């Protein structure tokens, strides 16, 4: 499914209903007083975080969201009906900005989070309100106020616990497919993953975490090379980064240079992102004899002066992936999510 991480939409709240100009007209009461009712408030537009929604794709086909207007007041002191609020479900992790001012309106993180993005107009008053000792038959009413209207920018950052880093063809898509139910497109050419993928890794019945696979980076991405760094923002809310490294690249490239290229792109994109906990995961160890694979991994560790956690896996054969997933689960449970 194509992933949409940005959308633009116009929201219009309902206008308030006008107040009513009316007088009592009943038999034997020739000069009845004012009985004009108030209008109804206009409906508001709300965004609600819904865990059953996972993209912003619907907003590509529905660019205008409009709540109902309030009904006008009526005689016999009857108020107009309030306009119905418009409740719009959005994915967890949606950030809402005012398109014109870039003002942050709100962030919808947890299921059920509710955000008013356009407030309905207040109702108008009927002529009953303007009766006084000197004016027994007021002909004055007020109009309902216009509802708020604004252009919005919606941005979706994936709410994943673990993010995958790596150059194209490092095996990230194969890894997420091996450990979760995600089914990203997998092939042997750069940029196979053109849109972010989420996978749920379930290590036991009630122990699971979410992992995000984003398009592979290449050196110079921050200058626009390859797919650029536009998808790196999806990793900003993760607690941990897994750096997938191909230790047997078919093009003969140097894994150390590949790792350093990724680190450089991270630092250029965001200092906070570059300082997140990061584990090295050496992939495709099945393509080398065990002693050669061990020696190559150790060489990379030494050249990088790497002090962090290291794992050796074969994603395609699911070798070493179970231990890695259990260790990830333990790390996440020890370090509670804080967004």
UniProtKB/Swiss-Prot annotation:
Pfam families with a match to the protein in the record: GTP1_OBG, MMR_HSR1
Chain sites annotated for binding Mg(2+): 173, 193
Residues of the OBG-type G domain: 160-333
Any GO BP annotation: ribosome biogenesis
Keyword Transferase assigned: no
Domain spans labelled Obg: 1-159
Source domain of life: Bacteria
Region (Disordered): 127-147
Gene3D superfamilies (UniProt xref): GTP1/OBG domain, P-loop containing nucleotide triphosphate hydrolases
Subunit architecture: Monomer.
PANTHER family the UniProt entry points to: DEVELOPMENTALLY REGULATED GTP-BINDING PROTEIN-RELATED, MITOCHONDRIAL RIBOSOME-ASSOCIATED GTPASE 2
Protein name in the entry: GTPase Obg
Gene: obg
């Amino acid at each position: 499914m194509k992933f949409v991480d940005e959308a633009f939409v116009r929201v219009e709240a309902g206008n308030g209903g006008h107040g009513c100009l009316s007088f009592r007209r009943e038999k034997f009461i020739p000069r009845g007083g004012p009985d004009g009712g108030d209008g109804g408030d206009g409906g508001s537009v709300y965004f609600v975080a819904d865990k059953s929604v996972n993209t912003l794709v619907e907003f590509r086909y529905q660019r205008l969201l409009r709540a109902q207007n309030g009904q006008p007041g009526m005689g016999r002191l009857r108020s107009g009906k309030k306009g119905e609020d418009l409740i719009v479900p959005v994915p967890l992790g949606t950030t809402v900005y005012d398109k014109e001012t870039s003002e942050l309106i709100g962030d919808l993180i947890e299921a059920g989070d509710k955000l008013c993005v356009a407030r309905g107009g207040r109702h108008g008053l009927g002529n009953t309100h303007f009766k006084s000792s000197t004016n027994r038959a007021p002909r004055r009413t007020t109009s309902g106020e216009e509802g708020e209207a604004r252009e919005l920018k919606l941005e979706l950052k994936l709410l994943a616990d673990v993010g995958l880093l790596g150059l194209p063809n490092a095996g990230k898509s194969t890894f997420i497919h091996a450990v979760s139910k995600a089914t990203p497109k997998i092939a042997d050419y750069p940029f196979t993953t053109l849109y972010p993928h989420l996978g749920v890794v379930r290590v036991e019945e009630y122990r699971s975490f979410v992992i995000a696979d984003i398009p592979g980076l290449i050196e110079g991405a921050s200058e626009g090379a390859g797919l650029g760094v536009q998808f790196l923002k999806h990793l900003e809310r993760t607690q941990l980064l897994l750096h997938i490294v191909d230790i047997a690249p078919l093009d003969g490239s140097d894994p150390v240079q590949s790792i350093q290229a990724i680190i450089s792109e991270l630092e250029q994109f965001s200092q906070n992102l570059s300082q997140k906990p990061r584990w090295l995961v050496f992939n495709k160890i099945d393509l080398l004899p065990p002693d050669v694979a061990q020696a190559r991994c150790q060489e990379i560790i030494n050249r990088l002066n790497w002090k962090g956690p290291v794992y050796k896996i074969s994603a395609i054969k699911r070798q070493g992936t179970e231990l890695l997933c259990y260790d990830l689960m333990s790390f996440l449970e020890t370090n509670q999510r804080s967004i």
